């Protein structure tokens, strides 16, 4: 598999907040392309299909019927959670499901989350 790029939606074993358990789920690659940190890892944001997680400025909702969600490979209504980030080793990424065509709303959510 080629290295995932910023904006790719990937299937990955995403660590839970307790750092003891994890769940295979989609996630969005946030890390800039060509970061060249010397480490084989990628910064990602969790994607949830739980509608109760929507409605916060740190989160971006994607309706399953939208062209955005279809391009990203998301079959369910989904929420990109920029307030739930993880750094994972590249080998933990199973596959690229698709690509989010426009990162503008996600970038705004990241700025809100990190006070940038």
Residue ranges, per PLM feature:
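Conserved functional hotspots at enzyme active or ligand-binding sites that engage polyanionic ligands
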Residues: 1-116
